[in-house]
Amino acid sequence: MEDLLRQNIQRTIGQQITDAQFEQFSSFLFLKSFDKKTILCEEGEHCKYVYFLLKGSAFSYLVNEYGDKHALQFALEGYWITDHYSFFSGKPGIYTIETLEAGQMLVLNRENFERICDSNHLFERFFRILIQNAFIGLQYRLAKTNSEDAEHRYAEFSNLYPAFIQRIPQYLIASYLGIKPQSLSRIRKEQAGKK
């Protein structure tokens, strides 16, 4: 736990933190275990926590009028996940977050989020950078979804996130990329044939 979280903080802020700073940061989080298919936040309900994955995987999604899940974000070990809209506004969530595998997470509530940011400027900087990176990633994904074909989107996704390809169900990856599962299957076969 300690190494994964500490590495995440240091990589994000681009500098080392002291043991005292790490202990201070860690004191605001609590450890929780989750089963597979646990709903962490549900659309329409207030999302009260930010989650840091130590073990396992999770994803966020919207459900359309036909009951189809549209994946928005994936998280494996070393990733943070939340419904930013609900967590920061206090309003009902706009999507659902569910575990894909059983695992453990460090959990941070809104009150402790404010305390952690107020306690040290490095921690406020850390979360600012995380939120900026989430926003940048979302803008980039929207631009690519609207300007590139499915083959390019999958190739880039598989190059950037090879661990996701191994652990996330293909139908969810297809949903994330905005394509049908059958199309993803065809693309994967074509790309495998080129290797």
Question: Where does each model-flagged region fall?
Answer:
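Residues that scaffold the ATP/ADP-binding catalytic core of kinase and kinase-like folds
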Residues: Y61, D83-H84, R115-I116, F157, ...
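Residues that recognize and position ribonucleotide moieties
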Residues: K32, Y51, Q73, E98, ...
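Cyclic nucleotide-binding regulatory module and flanking cytosolic helices
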Residues: M1-F30, S86
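Localized chelating/binding microdomains
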Residues: G14-I17, Q104, K144-S147
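A small-molecule sensor/coupling module
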Residues: G93, N112-D149, R153
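Phosphate-/nucleic-acid-contacting segments
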Residues: E148-K195
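Cyclic nucleotide-binding regulatory domains
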Residues: I39-T99
